């Protein structure tokens, strides 16, 4: 055993990964090494047995208490019944869950991982922690306390370790350099390479845009798209999702390169990369700084703490302005003043590009640190809205565009890219199976779907109709206005299918019969009570996370109380029982 420290993360949106990256920076500042960092699925399991002594896992929970996609293989392995109970007896373990207590299966993933690893012989390194994002202290508050206990435990194991100077620039993790030859690559000549060279890797397929039409009225603030594309050999079911792989816009990449003159001079020279970070689908075969920033590195997301913790090292403090800017960036990269980072980056939704442009006068970033500094562009997931087809996919996508408190327009990286796609354009995508499954057993289905939550419900409804099933479907849909964002009017105008029962709520129409979906549900208490209690109906709830899923569940509890005469406790247990039996499912994002 070599005494290695291994940090593994399971992350769907990047939050858990960010804490893992930041923790590695913090441990390196104590000269603790070697330290490995990888997703749960990317780290070789054999090394956990042969090299790792101290295992740190940071993991979020997604969907119905599920492990993030980059941790599913790891979870499948450790759940094998034939594994010996002393397999990991050499490992000392601590875990950190990134969660939100508004979800029923709060921090469920890290609980499962921690419990199973302890069953396989792990010893406790420092106390586990389950952070709650909606608590007053937020995830940071939990993390600070957990990290302090972890570092104290590790320093006890490594008595020779000590805090090194904060001024020392850490060595880059990834090896990137510019070719010394005089060769330059014309971006127009390799425009297809980032797509073609990645096809087939990690299940990536080629999609061709068929339609990209606006569903909402032109005078409505929200642009919602009906996005259809074709491909070959498709295999999906209602509830499955598509991951789209967007890219940055040329004007943004140009602005970034111009902010660092030393980059602009070599922007189209071939790059030499070794020790790549993991990226779903891999990197393009032909890379320059320009193509790396366009197709692989996220320059439009909000900069995170680990970004600033490295960035401040590259500011020239020889002038008064430089010294002040370096100090400011250092504060943003520290946990000592978390509100400073929030006010600068999160509150105004400031992008990485905007940050670099603001500090460009005193900032010189070495090429060798680019992969350490910039996050990777993540694929974005969308629920499939079409009934199963081997040739086509339909998505319902809300375009992210809004003004911040500083009156600047912000646009989502993926939806801005998607909005500009035209029929015939090609792009990369992959399909993921979901636990949100439909089974035609003739029992009724109650569907609750405000806004774009309609997408997976549309897939299900269209399949039932196409198969001429006798299954009764009850859809409770919510939006703001009947005439502006009434998506079901676009999909089932003049519905004549006797199996499909539509009820709509319009929150901003003063003459609407129901304001919210929960109002419509409660108004149909007698019907829903009969469907649930007497006909074993299933309930599917889809849409934005937050208040909606919680209030819908409370409404179902009230309906059960009203229909059966149960008290509050028994009605809650009944709904929990439906969840445990797979008859009540939520898909919130």
Curated annotation (Swiss-Prot):
Its cofactor is FAD; FMN. Gene3D superfamilies: 3.40.50.360, NADPH-cytochrome p450 Reductase, Chain A, domain 3 (1.20.990.10), Nucleotide-binding domain of ferredoxin-NADP reductase (FNR) module (3.40.50.80), Translation factors (2.40.30.10). It catalyses: 2 oxidized [2Fe-2S]-[protein] + NADPH = 2 reduced [2Fe-2S]-[protein] + NADP(+) + H(+). Its EC number is 1.18.1.-. The keyword Oxidoreductase applies. FAD binds at residues 349, 380-383, 412-415, 589. One of its GO terms (molecular function) is NADP binding. Keywords: Cytoplasm, FAD, Flavoprotein, FMN, Mitochondrion, NADP, Oxidoreductase. GO terms for biological process: cellular response to oxidative stress; iron-sulfur cluster assembly; nitric oxide biosynthetic process; positive regulation of nitric oxide biosynthetic process. Residues 202-439 form the FAD-binding FR-type domain. InterPro entries: CysJ-like_FAD-binding, FAD-bd_FR_type, Flavdoxin-like, Flavodoxin/NO_synth, Flavoprot_Pyr_Nucl_cyt_Rdtase, Flavoprotein-like_sf, FNR_nucleotide-bd, NADPH_Cyt_P450_Rdtase_alpha. GO terms for cellular component: cytosol; cytosolic [4Fe-4S] assembly targeting complex; mitochondrion. Transmembrane segments: none annotated. FMN binds at residues 11-16, 60-63, 98-107, 133. NADP(+) binds at residues 452, 507-508. It is found in: Cytoplasm; Mitochondrion. It is an enzyme of class 1 (oxidoreductase). Residues 5-151 form the Flavodoxin-like domain. Its main location: cytoplasm. Interacts with DRE2; as part of the cytosolic iron-sulfur (Fe-S) protein assembly (CIA) machinery. Belongs to the NADPH-dependent diflavin oxidoreductase NDOR1 family. In the N-terminal section; belongs to the flavodoxin family. NADPH-dependent reductase which is a central component of the cytosolic iron-sulfur (Fe-S) protein assembly (CIA) machinery. Transfers electrons from NADPH via its FAD and FMN prosthetic groups to the [2Fe-2S] cluster of DRE2, another key component of the CIA machinery. In turn, this reduced cluster provides electrons for assembly of cytosolic iron-sulfur cluster proteins. Positively controls H(2)O(2)-induced cell death. This is NADPH-dependent diflavin oxidoreductase 1. It comes from Candida albicans (strain SC5314 / ATCC MYA-2876). The gene is TAH18.
């Amino acid at each position: 055993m070599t005494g290695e420290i291994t940090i593994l993360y399971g992350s769907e949106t990047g939050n858990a990964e960010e804490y893992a990256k930041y923790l590695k920076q913090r441990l390196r500042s104590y000269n603790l090494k070697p330290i490995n960092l990888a997703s749960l699925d990317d780290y070789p399991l054999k090394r956990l047995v042969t090299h790792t002594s101290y295992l740190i896992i940071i993991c979020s929970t997604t969907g119905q208490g599920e492990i993030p996609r980059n941790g599913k293989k790891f979870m499948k392995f450790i759940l094998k019944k034939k594994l010996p109970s002393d397999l990991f007896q050499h490992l000392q373990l601590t875990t950190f869950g990134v969660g939100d207590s508004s979800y029923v299966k709060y921090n469920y993933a890290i609980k499962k991982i921690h419990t199973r690893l302890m069953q396989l012989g792990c010893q406790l390194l420092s106390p586990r922690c389950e952070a709650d994002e909606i608590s007053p202290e937020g995830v940071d508050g939990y993390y600070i306390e957990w990290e302090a206990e972890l570092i104290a435990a590790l320093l006890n194991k490594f008595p020779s370790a000590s805090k090194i100077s904060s001024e020392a620039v850490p060595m880059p993790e990834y090896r990137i350099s510019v070719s010394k030859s005089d060769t330059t690559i014309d971006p127009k000549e390799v425009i297809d390479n980032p797509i073609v060279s990645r096809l087939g890797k990690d299940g990536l397929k080629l999609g061709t845009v068929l339609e990209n039409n606006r569903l909402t009225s032109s005078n409505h603030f929200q642009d919602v798209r009906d996005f259809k594309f074709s491909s070959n050999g498709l295999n999906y079911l209602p509830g499955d999702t598509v991951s789209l792989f967007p890219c940055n816009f040329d004007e943004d990449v140009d602005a970034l390169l111009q902010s660092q003159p030393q980059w602009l001079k070599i922007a189209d020279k071939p790059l030499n990369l070794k020790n790549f970070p993991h990226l779903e689908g891999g990197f393009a075969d032909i890379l320059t700084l320009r193509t790396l920033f366009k197709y692989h590195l996220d320059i439009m997301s909000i900069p995170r703490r680990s970004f600033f913790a490295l960035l401040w090292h590259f500011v020239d403090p020889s002038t008064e302005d430089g010294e002040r800017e370096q100090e400011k960036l250092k504060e943003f990269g520290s946990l000592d003043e978390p509100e400073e980072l929030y006010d600068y980056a999160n509150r105004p939704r400031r992008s990485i590009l905007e940050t670099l442009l603001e500090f460009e006068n005193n900032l010189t970033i070495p090429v060798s640190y680019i992969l350490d500094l910039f996050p990777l562009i993540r694929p974005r997931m969308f629920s499939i809205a079409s009934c199963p087809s081997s040739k086509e996919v339909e998505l319902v996508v809300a375009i992210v565009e809004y003004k911040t408190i500083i009156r600047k327009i912000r646009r989502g990286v993926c939806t801005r890219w998607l909005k500009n796609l035209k029929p015939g354009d090609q792009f990369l995508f992959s399909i993921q199976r979901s636990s949100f499954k439909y089974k035609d057993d003739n029992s009724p289905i109650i569907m609750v779907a405000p806004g774009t939550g309609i997408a997976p419900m549309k897939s299900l409804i269209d399949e039932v109709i196409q198969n001429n099933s006798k299954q009764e479907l009850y859809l409770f849909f919510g939006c703001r206005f009947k005439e502006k964002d009434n998506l079901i009017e676009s999909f089932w105008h003049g519905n004549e299918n006797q199996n499909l029962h539509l009820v709509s709520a319009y929150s901003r129409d003063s003459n609407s019969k129901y304001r919210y979906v929960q109002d419509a549900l409660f108004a149909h208490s007698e019907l829903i009570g009969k469907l649930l209690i007497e006909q074993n109906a299933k309930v599917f709830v889809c849409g934005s996370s937050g208040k909606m899923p919680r209030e819908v569940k409370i409404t179902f509890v009230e309906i059960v109380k009203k229909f059966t005469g149960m008290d509050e406790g028994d009605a809650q247990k009944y709904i929990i029982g439906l969840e445990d039996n797979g008859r009540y499912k939520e898909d919130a994002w």
